[in-house]
Amino acid sequence: MLEKINADIVSAMKEHDTLKLSTLRLLKGAVDLERINKRVDKLNDDNIIAIIAKQIKTRKESIVEFERGNRQDLIDKTNSEIEILSAYMPEQISEEELSNIIEQAIKEVNATTIKDMGSVMKIVSSKVKGRADMQQVSSIIKNKLN
C-alpha cells in the first residue's frame, strides 16, 4: 500500500495536481510518524488503512467546523481530500451486509441489553475491520439492543 501511495505522489507531481500531492504527502507523513512511534521498519496494510481512516475522520470533523464558519471553499477542498484518501480504503460494506453481521454477532454472544454492546462490538469490529464506519456500527448495535 505504501508503494502505491509513493507512486501516486510521483504521478501527482508529474501531473502538477497540487491538491492530490499535498494530501498524499500529509498521509505519507502520518504513516512515517506512526512507523517511528511504533519503532518498526515497515507498517502493514492494516495499520496504513487505520491511519487513512483517521485522516478521513479528522477531515469530516473539519467540514463540520467549516460549515459553521460558512467557508464553502474549505468545505470543497476538504471533500476533495476525502475523495483522494477514500481511494486507498477497502470497499465499504453495505448497510444490509453490516446489519446481517451485527445480527449474527448479537446471536453469537446472546446479547439482550446495551450492557452486552462491548462484546458485540468486539466481534463486529474484527469482521468489518476498515470496511465500515465504527460510529455507524455502534449506533446500529444500540438500536438493535434497545
Identify the meaning behind each predicted range.
Residues 135:
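Key DNA-contact positions within bacterial/archaeal DNA-binding proteins
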Residues 2-88, 92-103, 107-108, 112-114, ...:
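N-terminal cationic and glycine-rich segments that engage phosphates or anionic surfaces
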